[in-house]
A protein has these predicted regions:
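Short, small-residue-biased leader/transition segments that mark boundaries at the very start
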Residues: 1-4
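Conserved P-loop
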Residues: 8-78, 133-136
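Generic beta-sheet signal
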Residues: 9-11, 38, 85-90, 122
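Amphipathic alpha-helical interface surfaces
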Residues: 19, 67, 71-74, 85, ...
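N-terminal targeting/trafficking signals and adjacent low-complexity tails
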Residues: 81-82
Length: 145
């Protein structure tokens, strides 16, 4: 089977630094080479027209998510319904996962286990400076703005 190691990747930087553009550029270039499906989670539908039409946008704000457990359950629900899923993008990760003033390490660690188990990549934009992030997630940073 597919021996490619799935992973969790972070695009980090303070608000307004251009993380969403990096995320959109990444998803739109990856979609050309990926056979399976891609889902993009965001806090609104604002970026709908900037996404390739093969990417499914889900506006998480519509689903009454109140904490990180509900968010992870929501993500598992999406995975359970799509056996071709290869990548999930989480824009405004802190907001959509209800982690705005919280430590993200436990959630990132669980996403890592899910990534391995379900063979899905997770690419997250995180509105924090690299210096504000726990050591345990620093090796997952692919872009620091």
């Amino acid at each position: 089977g597919d021996v490619y190691k799935r992973q969790v990747q972070l695009i980090v930087g303070k608000k307004g630094k251009g993380k969403t553009k990096q995320l959109l550029d990444k998803v739109n270039s990856e979609v050309k080479d990926i056979a399976g499906s891609i889902v993009y989670l965001d806090k609104s539908t604002k970026h709908m027209y900037e996404l390739n039409n093969k990417v499914r946008l889900i506006d998480v704000s519509r689903y009454m998510i109140e904490n990180e457990s509900e968010f992870l359950g929501f993500v598992c629900g999406i995975i359970s319904q799509d056996h071709d899923l290869e990548q999930m993008y989480f824009d405004s990760f802190l907001k959509i996962a209800a982690l705005e003033d919280k430590d993200i390490s436990a959630v990132v660690e669980k996403l890592e286990r899910m990534s391995d188990f379900f063979q899905v990549d997770f690419i997250l934009s995180v509105s924090r400076d690299e210096s504000e992030l726990p050591e345990s997630v620093k090796d997952k940073i692919i872009v620091s703005l």
